[in-house]
């Protein structure tokens, strides 16, 4: 029988109704793994983002493999599915969102040097192919995660966590 450690928090540090959403929307373009989609839901809930947009072939709830890694976050994070990511990106741009692609393009700025203009929409692509050229071209900025190892590669859901928490840190510093 497994028991919780006595020092582990079982409730949120801040009441949910007191949390203002982080002005970030994430668009997942053609993310193949439903486990990665579920991980994005869970991290999106932890960072209290505005919305998750699931585009192209990206799977969407209800699906058991999403639920397995989301642990219920698919019920708490606002989300939508679209087959037309370009139209959603255009609507976000009209609403004054900065559109930032997480890519390793030659023009990408380092995540730690990037000064985002909130609100921001972050674009993540397929696990091995990245964003389609058409979607990548719609970004105002390309941002890369600095990597020191030889692979120069992170799992897309892991990359999402890295980027979201750097954005959370930057946003909180702006509010201080």
Regions inferred by a protein language model and the residue ranges of each:
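Post-transcriptional modification and biogenesis factors for structured RNAs
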Residues: 1-176
